[in-house]
Swiss-Prot record:
Keyword Disulfide bond attributed: no
Signal peptide: none
Cited function: Catalyzes the interconversion of L-rhamnose and L-rhamnulose.
Essential cofactor(s): Mn(2+)
InterPro entries registered for this protein in UniProt: L-rhamnose_isomerase, Rhamnose_isomerase, Xyl_isomerase-like_sf
Protein's UniProt name: L-rhamnose isomerase
Pathway: Carbohydrate degradation; L-rhamnose degradation; glycerone phosphate from L-rhamnose: step 1/3
């Protein structure tokens, strides 16, 4: 009890300090509690899935490491996810890829139906979670010559068009069953290793294939689609069909959400700087918060400058209402549950940091060219007791404070993961 009282006491001191500069910490905590993070299932098993778990991971991505304890069945994955969610404050969502089917039936990607994901839906209901979805355009024999929807081979295109259509029905099913809009994100890794002669025709094929996938109108109360660009992948270094410009044009003209993945751009390019522009022209954004180290390496998200900047952009520009925040990283060199917990809690921390700024006052200073005050206040804020507010948020949401969560992860590793 003394431990809790100490956290509460420290919070009261922090609350007064923030109050002195016009920041209401109670409001900040209330806002943060309502923000759902879509945690990705694929960190739990290194992107293997359950459709063909022994198959090769393709699509220009790579999971490195062999830390023990990866999930091998849907039941194990759900068990691990439950442990992770128990260490993260608030109620969130789970982001599923199509290869995470849960069925005894032998089924291919162009045959999947809502019934193949019913166990996930029943579990999400029990846990109070929402579900997002992703068709899987990789790790499959029909990913031919680095192409799926942009393939010159009609048979290949048709297979993937059918997969895309079926994924929409599954996402719609999630939305109907769970009462939360399911975001269905389309990332298509099609590309060419070396300099292509014709960049135009594959993009035209991709555009036409996507138009066919999206032809049927679905109720956006249940499902909304996002389209995700990428600069390059392994084996597609020279050219990716679904570039940023392609999907910006496609998303805006087809009324789709634009997905921005932190690792899918040039190494010195940041997605935080793109949010305000997209907010002016697109219907909304799906974020894949990730950490690229020299390339799209999908490292676990840490509290670095870009994560802090993403939080600031969303809060300062009032973009939380049109932004869906998801995570996308997979590191097999560390405990996978710890990866989820660190990445999700850090994303929440970046939002809290931004919510604890006197945003209206700072905007007024900027408008009046009072750059001295703007700099002085933003610099002083760096030393404010943000950690005490975060610890209190964890406490009132019934999750471990500080490093206490790590003890739970280590115990779970000993009792469960190392016995697999």
């Amino acid at each position: 009890m003394g431990h809790e009282t100490e956290i509460s006491k420290r919070y009261q001191v922090a609350k007064e300090r923030y109050q002195a500069i016009g920041v209401d910490t109670e409001n900040a905590l209330k806002t943060l509690k309502d923000i759902k993070i879509s945690m990705h299932c694929w960190q739990g098993d290194d992107v293997k899935g359950f459709l063909n778990p022994d198959g090769e991971l393709t699509g220009g991505i790579m999971a490195t490491g062999n830390y023990p304890g990866a999930a091998h069945t849907p039941k194990q994955l759900r068990q691990d996810l439950e442990k992770a969610y128990s260490l993260i404050p608030g109620k969130h969502k789970l982001n599923l890829h199509a290869i995470y089917v849960d069925t005894d039936e032998k089924v291919d990607l162009n045959e999947i139906e809502p019934k193949h994901f019913t166990p996930w839906v029943e579990w999400a209901k029990e846990q109070g979670l929402g579900l997002d979805f992703n068709p899987t355009f990789f790790s499959h024999p029909m990913f031919k010559d680095n192409y799926t929807l942009a393939s010159p081979d009609k048979e290949v295109r048709d297979f993937w068009i059918e997969h895309g259509k079926r994924s929409r029905k599954i996402s719609e099913y999630f939305g109907k069953e769970l009462g939360q809009t399911s975001i269905n994100n389309f990332w298509v890794p099609d590309g060419i290793k070396d300099c292509p002669i014709d960049r135009y025709t594959p993009r035209k094929r991709l555009m036409e294939a996507l138009d066919e996938v999206f032809a049927e109108k679905l109720d956006e109360k249940y499902t909304q689609e996002a389209v995700e660009s990428k600069l390059f992948g392994l084996g597609a270094e020279a050219y990716t069909v679904g570039s940023h410009e392609f999907y910006m044009g496609y998303g805006i003209t087809r009324d789709k959400l634009i997905c921005l993945d932190a690792g899918h751009f040039h190494p010195t390019e940041v997605i935080s700087n793109k949010l305000s522009s997209l907010a002016l022209f697109s219907k909304g954004v799906m974020l894949h918060v990730s950490r690229p180290v020299r390339w799209d390496s999908d490292h676990v998200v840490i509290m670095d400058d870009e994560l802090i900047e993403i939080g600031r952009e969303l809060v300062r520009n009032d973009l939380l209402g049109i932004t869906n925040i998801g995570l996308d990283f997979f590191d097999a060199t560390i405990n996978r549950i710890a990866a989820w917990v660190v990445g999700t809690r850090n994303t929440q921390k970046s939002l809290l940091k931004a919510l604890l700024e006197p945003t209206a006052d700072l905007k007024k200073m900027e408008l009046e060219n009072d750059f001295t005050s703007r700099m002085a206040i933003t610099e002083e804020l760096k030393d404010f007791p943000f950690g005490d507010v975060w610890n209190y948020f964890c406490e009132i949401n019934g999750v471990p404070v500080g490093l206490d969560w790590l003890k739970e992860v280590k115990a779970y590793e000993e009792d469960v993961l190392l016995k697999r």
